[in-house]
Amino acid sequence: MTAQRDNVLLVHWHDLGRYLGAYGHPDVSSPRLDQLGAEGILFTRAHATAPLCSPSRGSLFTGRYPQSNGLVGLAHHGWEYRTGVRTLPHILSEAGWHTALFGMQHETSYPSKLGYHEFDVSNSYCEYVVEHATHWLSEPPKPPFLLTAGFFETHRPYPRERYDPADAVDVVVPDYLPDTGDIRQDLAEFYGSISVADAAVGRLLDTLEETGLDESTWVVFMTDHGPALPRAKSTLYDAGTGIALIVRPPRNTRTQPQVYGELFSGVDLLPTLLDLLGLDIPADIEGMSHARNLQRHDIEPVRTEVYTTKTYHDSFDPIRAIRTKEYSYIENYASRPLLDLPWDIAESAPGRIMKPLVLAQRPERELYDLVEDPTESHNLLGSDITDKAEAIANDLALLLDDWRNKTNDVIPSEFAGTRIAERYTETYLRIHGPQVTSRSAIASERGIQHDHSPGQ
């Protein structure tokens, strides 16, 4: 296969879900990303492999599921890639691309392991990232290059000195949350961070145009998982794993914009990018390339289902799911409340309001009709279960079990998993104290000391 030698600008955010105007949120101000979506390929059924930061990002950058690459929990709790796992920057560096990272990464406490030629992860607030990334783009190395710009936004918190909140009156509260003043205000603050980060992306896009690099650069925008709200982040519902993903081809390809409505998994990003760049896809990659569909507008689906997983967040909470265009089937492997809220959500206004409402025991199995019930509010495997629902669930369960076997997905016992989670969490708290450092954009506060590559 002949490499195309195009550049790649990859921009990723925290905790956004699909909260952009381009995804049907008119109450969100995101004009630059909406424009990017109109100019490129807007993915409407992209799903993270996991509803939390490190496992999701691990799949996006390796093309492998968390149980395969080893990143089944949060990097700042001590989880790391398995030895020998190669990332997108590793692969592109070996193929002749110059690779650089500015800002957020949440895959490791040792960023030099990620395979970039140069990196500065010391500060991941969007203005710092964009200042350094635009300077880098003004005098880039000899192409081709991969430039990754990682924003801390839109992770909690949303301090007003950084983000001017939207008008709470205009906020549309999602169906899975009660419509209260505190929740509206919380969403308004979230929207404020979106607007600031959107403008920062605009500066990157403007720099590409001003330098002429937009003619030869693939622009990829993505987030890791759903927003930090109850029944979104840290769950395997659509609001938890559904992600914004936009790909704009180089201007010189004259590729027509499109809305891509096929199912797309986080593990598919790496093989799709390699294919678009004309590079061979390594044999250990578990994702599928969608490049042919994106370039030729073919309508043959690449995949008919996506698989999602959660094992460790701030606690041991093992869940697996399979999702088609018509149904979502979830298996819960431990006795837990309806929602096991991670720290950042539990301490938020929506978390405090919702916590008393989600203490009932979670069912072992869940099935949702995504055509009739897109917000996944009525479990078809409840007391009113029908023969049809049971049959559909059984078929999906077989596919899920087959996928777990193929990916060597071993779920620890309740005793072992809980002890493992406690060990990682206790070590994290012993090192960092009660301050939750994952909510900081400053790498040194997150336990990452070697935050610059030599020369940065």
Label each region the model flagged.
Residues M1-L359, R365, P374-L398, D402, ...:
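Formylglycine-dependent sulfatase
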Residues L370-E372:
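Extracellular, beta-strand-rich glycan-interacting domains
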Residues A416-A421:
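Small-residue-rich loop/turn and linker elements
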